[in-house]
Amino acid sequence: MNNMGLEEYKGVFIYAQQVDNELSSIAFELIGKAKELAKDLGTDVTAVLLGSNVKGLTDELGEYGADKVIVVDNPELKTYRTEPYAQALAAVINEYKPEIMLVGATAIGRDLGPTVSARVATGLTADCTKLEIGDFPINAVPGKEDEQKHNQLLMTRPAFGGNTIATIACPDNRPQMATVRPGVMQKLPKEAGRKAEVIEFNPTLEKNNRYVDILNVVKAVGNVENIMDAKVLVSGGRGVGSKENFKMLQDLADVFGGMVSCSRAAVENGWLAQDYQVGQTGKTVRPQIYFAIGISGAIQHVAGMEESDLIIAINKDEDAPIFSVADYGIVGDLNKIVPALTEALKAEMKNK
C-alpha cells in the first residue's frame, strides 16, 4: 500500500499459526510482543486465525492477551497451502488495515509472510531479533528534522551473514510486516477466563492454477527432545574437538537433568544433529543456566542464547567474544575443567 492513506491503518495484528487445529507456541509469543507495541501506539492487538473448524481456539488466544480475534473458517484452509492461506490473510489485511502485521518465522510463516507482503505491496523484514516503536531515521538529519517520522516499527535483525546488526523500517507502506523466530519473544502469563472479541470474516477464496492438491501427509516421527524446553543447557562448539568429547558435556548436563546443545561448527563437523543447534540458523533458547564450552561467541551464536538467565563460558582463549556476554568465565583447557567441574557438582549435590 502506498503512502497516500497511511493514517487509515491502525492496530497490531499477529498471524495465529495453528497446525491440526492446535495453536503453535509462536502465536502466543507474538501476542506478547504485540501487546508491548500496541501499548506504545495506544492501540489494541488482533490475532488472525485461519483454518477449518478452528473457532474453538479463540478463547485461548484471548487468555494469552489478544483483544480481538479475526477468524476465517473455511474447508479450503484445513491444511496449510500457500495459495488459499495467502488469499485469506491478504483479504484480512485489505479489509481491516492493520498498522503492523507480525508472522512467525516457522516453515509456514516463512512461506506465507513474503507471499502476502508482495500481494499487499508492502515490505517485510525477516527473522527479527528485536521489535520496538521509535523514530525513523533514528537520528534526525540536521536541517531536515521535520522529515523524521514518529511511531514507526523499528525491526532489528542480523545482516551480512550475521556479522552486523541492521535496524530496518518501512515508513512509506502499510502494514509494516515482520517475521520473528520461535523463542525470540516471550509469551505473557495465561489469564484464565479472559475473553477476546471474536470477528468472523468470510472472504471469497478463488481456486486458480496456484492451488495444489494435498495427496497425503506423512508426519515426521522423532524422539528428539526440544532444547528450547531445557532449564539447563551444556553447549559445545568447535573447541570441544570431537564427537566423543561431547560425552564429557553430557555428563555435566546429567548432573542438572539438563541437555546438551551446540554451535553451528559442531553440526557442520557432524558431532550433533541440527536439532541441537543454538544460534541464528538454529534455535533461540532461554534456559536458567547456559554453559558455553569451546564456543568462541560469534554474533550468530550469541543471538540465540544471550537472554539465558546465567551464562557460564569455558574457553582457552581469554579474548574469545563469548566472555563479553558471560556472567562467569573460566579460561583454560576444557578437557581438564569440565570433568573437574562435573565431579565437584556431583559431590555438592550429594551433600545436599
Where are the language model's segments positioned?
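N-terminal glycine-rich FAD/FM-binding segment characteristic of electron-transfer flavoproteins
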Residues: 1-352
